[in-house]
Amino acid sequence: MAKRVTGPEIEKLIQLLAKVPGLGPRSARRAALHLIKKKEQLLGPLGHAMGEAYDKVKICSCCGNVDTIDPCTVCADDRRDQSVIIVVEDVSDLWALERAGAMNTAYHVLGGTLSPLDGVGPEDLNIKGLIDRVSAGGIRELIIAVNATVEGQATAHYITDRLSGLGIKITRLAHGVPVGGELDYLDEGTLTAALRARTTI
């Protein structure tokens, strides 16, 4: 049995940090030690920021984004084209698309993908909210921006089937060769998708 080398408060900090995606037990220990060493500059402000987030963060009732207001900043922005909705799996995907700055539209966060093997069905995702938004009218295009996984594609097909009779344009992101990518390094699935989604130049 391993000996304890620190108090329960620090052990708890390490255990909680280890639950953050991307941090295992070893990385969590390093992060905890760094925070403790920089107690005034990092640990205190981080604890305060986390408390504020716990008190103030809300899930947008319209799109599923996280913010401190409801509806969120994206939904409340009247400069956006609210007739186009980009459908994403997770909030991190919404943020990634916003960083790219390619579109100035509305979003809808599903909260995951359909996965029968994991017991995730349509009722477990924010699909009903999407159907309600589209059914209310004023939407001309839905851009399905889910990951190119089996679950992502199954989710895209399910949404397309559910909304096919509403007379809106439904598109999805192109899949294929990334900018700066070399063909020799791409897998067969990516190359096949790129060939099928080829465009005229």
UniProtKB/Swiss-Prot annotation:
NCBIfam families: recR (TIGR00615). PROSITE patterns: RECR, TOPRIM. This is Recombination protein RecR. Gene3D superfamilies: 3.40.1360.10, 6.10.250.240, RecR Domain 1 (1.10.8.420). PANTHER family: RECOMBINATION PROTEIN RECR. The keyword Cell membrane does not apply. The gene is recR. Belongs to the RecR family. GO terms for molecular function: DNA binding; zinc ion binding. The keyword Ion transport does not apply. A zinc finger (C4-type) spans 60-75. It comes from Agrobacterium fabrum (strain C58 / ATCC 33970). May play a role in DNA repair. It seems to be involved in an RecBC-independent recombinational process of DNA repair. It may act with RecF and RecO. GO terms for biological process: DNA recombination; DNA repair. Residues 83-178 form the Toprim domain. Keywords: DNA damage, DNA recombination, DNA repair, Metal-binding, Zinc, Zinc-finger. InterPro entries: DNA_Rcmb_RecR, Rcmb_RecR, Rcmb_RecR_Znf, TOPRIM_dom, TOPRIM_RecR. Pfam families: RecR_C (PF21175), RecR_HhH (PF21176), RecR_ZnF (PF02132), Toprim_4 (PF13662).
